[in-house]
A protein has these predicted regions:
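A short, acidic/glycine-rich surface segment
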Residues: 14-17, 53-56, 96-102
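Residues that mark the start of a beta-strand
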Residues: 2, 30-32, 157
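Short polar catalytic/cofactor-binding loops
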Residues: 7-11, 38-40
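NAD(P)H dinucleotide-binding glycine-rich loop of Rossmann-like/cofactor-binding domains
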Residues: 89-158
Length: 158
């Protein structure tokens, strides 16, 4: 498959466009998503440059924010089907190590990505992949700021 691969931390030149990168294989609780759209955000730049205290495994495929279609299911995946349109929540909450898709595991700057089923968000038919790919980190940042800085409480309107 084609992928934008970071082989070492550095400037923009450290990203290599690979045309024969191995296709991902799903673990039992994962799906393979054919990426329909991906966007870049500040965290992708941090992943490329390197971040103090976070060891990013190399080579790395960045891309936290992406959306696409499920094309393969791991054997334990329930409630999802081939052809389902999904957006990805990049925060890995189900593992003690945590981390992000596109940081500690391959992300969406590739044709295909293995994604834990817990990180899938059903995408309505009237929302484009491009629009959905703009949401995860930007939305998560805005939501967190509403709670932490704005101290918005349940029932309040913004």
């Amino acid at each position: 498959m084609r992928a934008a691969v970071i082989h070492e931390h550095g400037g923009p030149g450290c990203i290599q466009y690979e045309t024969n990168w191995p296709d991902p294989k799903p673990l039992d609780d994962e799906v393979i998503v054919k990426v329909g759209a991906a966007t870049l955000n500040y965290h992708d730049i941090f992943t490329r440059k390197g971040m103090p205290g976070i060891k990013v495994p190399m080579p790395c495929i960045a891309g936290l924010d992406f959306a696409g279609e499920i094309v393969e299911l791991g054997k334990d995946v329930k409630g999802w089907h081939k052809g389902d349109r999904v957006m990805i929540d990049p925060v890995i909450r189900h593992l003690p190590s945590g981390g992000l898709i596109g940081e500690l595991r391959p992300g969406g700057l590739a044709e295909y990505c293995a994604v834990p089923d817990q990180n899938l968000v059903k995408l309505p038919d009237d929302v484009s992949y491009e629009a959905a790919a703009c949401l995860p980190v930007a939305y998560g940042t805005a939501l967190r700021m509403m709670y932490t800085i704005g101290e918005v409480k349940k029932g309040e309107k913004v």
